[in-house]
Amino acid sequence: MSKYKISVYAICKNESKNIIKWYNSMKEADEIIVLDTGSTDDSINILKKLPKIKLYEEKIIPWRFDTARNKSLSYVSQDTDICVCTDIDEVFEKGWRKDLEESWNSSITRAKYLYNWNFDKYGKPATTFYLDKIHNRNDYTWTHPVHEVLKCLKKENIILLPNVVLNHHQDQNKSRHTYLPLLELSVKEHPNDDRNVHYLGREYMYYEKWDDCIKTLHNHLKLPTATWKDERSASMRYMAFSYYKKGYIEEAIMWYQNAIKEAPYLREPYYDLGNIYYLEKDYINSEYYLKKALKVKEKSLSYINEEKAWNETIYDLLSISCFYNKKYKEAIKYIKKAIKINKANQRLLDNYTYMQKYNI
């Protein structure tokens, strides 16, 4: 018999492609709550046929993620010991319940677990960090209209579950069009919330609103609560990229250097600066900073990770930089490393063949 009653709760809209895979990983729970917020595909019919699913339907107007999360949480049985909030494009690895129950006790309010946010082209985790959406029944509420936060209403007692792994398989065809206005609303409601000011600046970058990105992230860096160096460094990198896209090369380089100073233990700012020098055909500085990036061996468990700093791309750029710097043996060494990661890339193979002619 199980020690605890565990309930999974989720919101759903047009997830027919993901429901079965999600359900099969969640059915270790005692109860599964789904709030459908207006599906027009076959989601509702699929959900109705699945045992354990308790389906509710309600449109949230105006749309806010925190309102939808809180509504779905309200349907979780009051005698639940542990609540698990997931999205329907996420899948737990088998055995998650056993690991959770073995670590949980009545004094715990929340658990963090490993989250593979995305995967590289070879199916390996690319961005991994700890997520914290497992919690007790009555001490939490959701806040913020997007990039919603699970807020504790009392003193927290958090445990770490490194053996519980949740994998995210994002549908790249799904629109993010609501994110920007919701982030603007979130920052309007909470102008001193450093986390969402950072997210808003990043979103402006995604939309190529370079001036808005720079202004917003300047504000992020000024906030007294913006103390997490990883995120501060990321804000500086996004500002640098925006300056670069505006044609202000010196400002871009300055902010990449600031990002390095802020978090010298991260690979990403070195890589980004090396990449800018590469694009500007300054191969001496490109080689220098890409080699500095490779000295950072440990990938941080935060969402800040950038795939290109850790896959074949960094070796590809470094091999070309070394080649133009007439360091042919090193160029071949690094192109081999790139090919080892991506054996199917014909351009890399062609570069290797070409570089060998100079390895005399």
What are these regions (language model features)?
Residues 70-82:
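Active-site nucleotide-sugar/metal-binding loop of Leloir-type enzymes
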Residues 25, 35-46, 60-62, 87-91:
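A conserved acidic beta->alpha catalytic loop
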